[in-house]
Curated annotation (Swiss-Prot):
This is Pseudouridine-5'-phosphate glycosidase 1. Pfam families: Indigoidine_A. Gene3D superfamilies: Indigoidine synthase domain. It comes from Rhizobium johnstonii (strain DSM 114642 / LMG 32736 / 3841). Substrate binds at residues 101, 121, 155-157.
């Protein structure tokens, strides 16, 4: 059970009914005008097992600090929206077993019912924007699931990218998804998709999906400038920055496709649906790859955190 930490700086609620708490580090950064990078918490609670999840979370936060920015891991704890977690809270969240996975549809529910919830990409974007944080680092976004023409399973992440003005740095859409359809939805919704230092859109564990990226840029400063001009033009919505996993850590896309197909077949046999699909597939792929998928996942998250911090610093220059 997560304890109620007293080591927090309570701030004026975003609205009269919404309790929000900034960690001391984040509150200090906001006061100084220091660059901030938002981090989701679902990757901690639903993405990998303990203690690997807490080690990854600490490493990612340290990487952001090394680049001159401040990490802000976002979660709902006992109905309070936390922007930044103290060390003890991060540890407790990593060990917790009964944590909601909250998106746009149920973020308010978790707060209203005083639940504890880990934020998805969509929920983290909402919280980051409310807190004035312009950059967010994650592993991979959700998107259009394979077979969506029958299941209609499409992640709320795509709609959030069209609505909320946050730069999301990721390693592309998760490769378990239908990447071409995911990119089509993003194009339809007017979301700019920029691949960093590559002409090809990445596929999470693999550096290339075989699909040409809509846009590409080669420096954090160029990405920051692009977003600044969008804001000056009054263009709503976020930007997706796809950062290919380091070459030394990737799993070839041809090899990954074999594992993904096996995992999808298993999910169909077990009749897995809804929010349970992605965690199930990731867990199955972990087993099929003898843990290599998790090692690659950690490497790409760390790589994304580094780029996100560089972009956040560039936005402040």
């Amino acid at each position: 059970m997560l304890s109620r930490s007293q080591d927090k700086t309570m701030t004026k609620p975003i609205s009269p009914l919404l309790p929000i708490a900034y960690s001391k580090e984040v509150a200090s950064a906001k006061q100084r005008g220091a660059p901030l990078v938002a981090l989701e918490s679902t990757i901690i609670t639903h993405g990998m097992p303990y203690p690997g999840n807490i080690e990854m979370a600490r490493s990612v936060e340290a990487i952001i600090r090394e680049q001159g920015a401040v990490p802000a891991t976002i979660a709902v704890i006992h109905g309070t929206l936390h922007i930044g977690l103290e060390a003890a809270e991060l540890e407790q969240l990593a060990k917790a077993t009964e944590v909601m996975k909250v998106s746009r549809a149920d973020l308010a529910f978790a707060i209203a019912e005083r639940r504890t919830g880990a934020t998805t990409v969509a929920a983290t974007m909402i919280a980051a924007a409310r807190a004035g944080i312009r950059v967010f680092a994650t592993g991979g976004i959700g998107g259009v699931h394979r077979g969506a023409e029958e299941s209609f399973d499409i992640s709320a992440d795509l709609e959030e990218l069209a609505r909320t003005g946050v730069i999301v740095v990721c390693a592309g859409a998760k490769a378990i998804l239908d990447i071409p359809k995911t990119l089509e939805v993003l194009e339809t919704r007017g979301v700019p998709v920029v691949t960093y230092e590559s002409e090809e859109f990445p596929a999470f564990w693999s550096r290339s999906s075989g699909i040409r990226s809509p846009l590409s840029l080669n420096s954090p400063a160029a990405i920051a400038n692009f977003q600044t001009v969008r804001e000056q033009l009054g263009i709503d919505g976020g930007m997706l920055v796809a950062n290919p996993v380091p070459e030394a850590d990737e799993i070839a896309s041809e090899e990954m496709e074999i594992y993904i197909e096996r995992a999808l077949d298993s999910a169909e046999r077990d009749e897995v649906t809804g929010k349970a699909v992605t965690p199930y597939l990731l867990s199955t792929i972990f087993d099929l790859t003898d843990g290599q998928s998790l090692k690659t996942n950690i490497a790409l998250v760390e790589n994304n955190a580094r780029l996100a911090a560089e972009i956040a610093v560039a936005l402040g220059e």
